[in-house]
Amino acid sequence: MALGAGHAHACRDDGDDSVIDAPPPYESVAGASAGQFVVIDIDTPTDSPPPYSAGTSPVGLVSPASSGDGEVCERGRSRRAAWRAARRARRRAERRARRRSFGPGGLFVETPLFLPETMIGAHPGVGGDLPSGLPTYAEATSDRPPTYAMVMAACPTEPPGGSVGPADQPRVQSSRTWRPPLVNSRELYRAQRAARCASSSDTPQAPGWCGGTCRHAVFGVVAVVVVIILAFLWR
């Protein structure tokens, strides 16, 4: 305000004929908030919605302004839709029951399969050849292998034919099987040399006879040579 008033006075002092008025006074926020506000009503419902019902359909909702014939038609449509939904649900339940009633291999089972913490049971008269050591539902979901006792109980000990052929009989092996003796190469050489010496002479000799005779003969020859050399040197 002071700036605008000063500017007006300056213009008057300059001698200008046009008079410039001061700007309007500033209105604070408090003054603006005291005014009237426009409220827009968009017809927002404040009541809670009706409870959900599986038998009703959005098609069945009829405005009160509709005629009586239209109301009857809408009610008939909603009833037919509810009947169709009920028939579909019944058929789905029957299909699930049929799927549960057939066990592994297509055999009919009265009790439902894959019950938690229960063994898979079959009718006593149907599927009697099924293995009895099947794991439970919890063991199957946790992916734990069956124990050795369960596997042995499930596997049949005898073939279905009852008779075992000669080719199927297990070979009876004694615990004392023949094995070649562990012989040292030196001992083998001595045995072979003794066998050669024994085969060359008619009289049976001891195993060490061939070696001792050869040594004595060599010593005798050496002694004779030494004696001859000493005799020549003595003369």
Curated annotation (Swiss-Prot):
It comes from the Viruses. It is a single-pass membrane protein. The chain crosses the membrane at residues 214-234. InterPro entries: Herpes_UL56 (IPR007620). Keywords: Host cytoplasm, Host Golgi apparatus, Host membrane, Membrane, Transmembrane, Transmembrane helix. Pfam families: Herpes_UL56. GO terms for cellular component: host cell Golgi membrane; membrane. The keyword Magnesium does not apply. Residues 1-27, 45-74 are annotated as: Disordered. A motif (PPXY motif) lies at residues 23-26, 49-52, 144-147. It is found in: Host Golgi apparatus membrane; Host cytoplasm. Plays a role in the transport and release of virions form the host cytoplasm to the extracellular space. Relocalizes host NEDD4, a cytosolic E3 ligase, to cytoplasmic vesicles. Late-budding domains (L domains) are short sequence motifs essential for viral particle budding. They recruit proteins of the host ESCRT machinery (Endosomal Sorting Complex Required for Transport) or ESCRT-associated proteins. UL56 contains three L domains: the PPXY motifs which are involved in the interaction with ITCH, a member of the NEDD4 family. Belongs to the herpesviridae UL56 family. Interacts with host ITCH; this interaction induces ubiquitination and degradation of ITCH. Interacts with host NEDD4; this interaction increases NEDD4 ubiquitination. Interacts with UL11. This is Protein UL56.
